[in-house]
Amino acid sequence: MIRFLQHSEINPEKWNQAVRNSLSPNVLSEYELLDLLTGDDTWHALVQDDYETVMPLPTRKKGVLKYVYTPFFLPQMGIFHRQELPQYKFDLFLEEVSEHYVLADLLMNEQNTWDWKKGLTPYFVSYALFLHLPYNELYSQFHENTRRNIKAAQKQQSQVTLQEEKVADIIALFRNNRGQGENVHFRDDDYTRLQRVSDYLLEHNLLEVYGVRTAQNELAAGALFVKDGKRRWFWFSGRDNQLSETKPMFLLLDTYIRDHAESDLELDFNGSNNPNVARLYQSFGGTRYPIPFHRVYKNKFWRLLLTIARKGSMQ
């Protein structure tokens, strides 16, 4: 039986166990982190039986209308299940979502690919790199241009730091550079939320902080990697555009891969809709995989109404 639970009805311990024991565990979808990621909003959930299968539903309101959204800095959501989930059960979860919301934008996870395999749903793309090989073998899989950029960065005599940079400085790098682009929609509250989540992750030894400083000790780039079991999320990064000629991000990622080579870890580049960023991830030997996206409407009336409203807002 699938139940809709309000936030206050969710058992935190059972929730976390369900996510951790699923086929697609994700520390950022655990109870405490969902609380931080949703901030002033909230989240509810669909729960099957005694937390055998769970689905988080971050919730916002526009007027009297409730809808599900994907919070910034949450790489994947979807349905968390311990065993293979049949198509009909997947459909039941989506139908249950439509019973409670007029609209739901659902970013799934790599185990929720039924409709994607049939070509019935759009998807985002991510890249993952298994780090079990020796560094030299991993390096040999980098694209030629990437190896060239790494060598150029090494000639700059920049230094890579570990757990020395402040998260706030890396956030500022992004905010003052790429964050000024018209396609970036982060608000002040989003940056504040990112800092709070980072503080929690640091406190629980779940965050690796890498930085690159030039020969003049200027912070050229920084990145935050989330430790999630055997997965490492390339979660957030920033770069100083004025120091881009030093190729700091190439040096940073190369160093991270070198540091973690010959381990049972997987580096997940966390995807990007920016084709230039996606090419960067692929150039480090990452393997492409899909993250399905579902848009669920309460009924045909709401689908038509919301489609008209969206078109009107674009004019």
Positions of PLM-derived features:
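A conserved beta-strand-loop-helix scaffold within acyl/acetyltransferase catalytic domains
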Residues: 2-49, 55-64, 109-244
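Short, high-confidence coil segments that cap the C-terminus of an alpha-helix
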Residues: 41-43, 99-103, 207, 262-264
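The substrate-binding groove and active-site-proximal loops of carbohydrate-active enzymes
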Residues: 75-83, 242
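Non-catalytic accessory segments adjacent to catalytic cores
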Residues: 86-126
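Aromatic (often tryptophan-rich) hydrophobic motifs at membrane interfaces
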Residues: 88-95, 196-304
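Short catalytic-loop micro-motif centered on adjacent basic/acidic residues
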Residues: 105, 161, 266-270
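Terminal substrate-recognition subdomain of acyl/acetyltransferases
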Residues: 111-156, 263, 271-315
